């Protein structure tokens, strides 16, 4: 029995002394080390909490937009509503290349007072734009008592559309 145990131990030791076979490589699971994706994955493993930069883009804007601000009869003071302020601020950023401000009135036969009203309305919008941070060199003012009618109606509801200042925003 003793010999049998000795022979079993000798066979066991002889089996352990032979080196294992090398693994066979198929190439199915190869990962290129220098590819951009692999480098980005490695960077994220090394610096996991590093924030990634995200690009912020302004929405595409048309090259020209016009907004009309309407005034009551013979009123020249510009008191914008919160909706008008939000609309104008949205149009003013990013900063436009140029802004044309055109003051208009509603009479077909312009008395001298209508020219003055159109001018003062345009200046009120001009001053408001400057107070909002727009450079004066980017703004052009014009005014005309009889021009560019939005409505040819001689009655009050149609004439309201003609008492306005057009703000034309040019992007190119």
UniProtKB/Swiss-Prot annotation:
Subcellular location: Cell outer membrane
Alphabetical list of InterPro entries matching this protein: OmpA-like, OmpA-like_sf
PROSITE patterns: OMPA_2, PROKAR_LIPOPROTEIN
First and last residue of the signal peptide: 1-15
Main location, first listed in the record: membrane
Keywords assigned by UniProt, alphabetized: Cell outer membrane, Lipoprotein, Membrane, Palmitate, Signal, Virulence
UniProt superkingdom: Bacteria
Topology relative to the membrane: Lipid-anchor
Covalently lipidated residues, kind S-diacylglycerol cysteine: 16
Annotated Pfam families: OmpA (PF00691)
Occurrences of domain OmpA-like (ranges): 58-172
Induction cue: Specifically induced within macrophages by phagosome acidification. Induced at 37 degrees Celsius in minimal medium, suggesting that nutritional stress is a regulating signal.
Entry GO terms, CC: cell outer membrane
Lipidation (N-palmitoyl cysteine): 16
Functional note: The VirB system could be required for the establishment of the replication niche in the host.
Note: Transcription of the operon is maximal in early exponential phase.
Name of the protein this chain belongs to: Type IV secretion system putative outer membrane lipoprotein BRA0058/BS1330_II0058
Species of the source: Brucella suis biovar 1 (strain 1330)
